[in-house]
Amino acid sequence: ANDERRDVMVCTYQYKWDADKKAHKLVENKKLTDWYPGKWRREWMPKGFVDPNNTGVNYCPLRYADVVLMAAEAYNEIGNTPEAWRLLNEVRHRAGATETNSLQAYKAAQPNLYELPYFNSGDEADNFRTALYWERGFELAFEGQRKYDLLRWGILGDALKLFQSKMDKSLKGKYDAGDKFIKGKHELFPIPLGELQANPALKNQNNPGYE
């Protein structure tokens, strides 16, 4: 409840030049298809800026909330799940979201979540992993972190297929990743041939699936 992150991560407007091209004005977009990722939005930039790539609104490659959630993940993996929940709640508190200490409470606070086919053993550690799966998505949306989370958890291919299954069936052909991902191969890129030839220590051995 009262989670402010959606309104930050989704931008429902555009800034456009006014008639004399001296300043920008805010124009609301009514259509959902005209909404954009809202992180580092121009709303935070000084009015009248000329170059949107030269302002005081900087891209953050690593945020404190990310560090806190990584610490929560680490505590959970070493068996200290209560401390993991405490740290996760630090992030939720800052966002105005309801603080929780169990997966049941987390689902009650976020009622539109769907069930995951992974992290489903039912023990407390897996329950926290499920909450963390969602929480990192809410907190770090559009920041380039999600793929690496899914890789770290070993569920990238499963997540791609799950997301595909939730889409409109008429759009399935437009989401090829769910069909074409090969587990054990597509987690990594191939090592370029030039690098293999330049480094004898690699023994001409490419990453799995690219031999």
Residue ranges and their predicted role:
Residues 4-211:
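Acidic/polar-rich alpha-helix caps and helix-coil junctions
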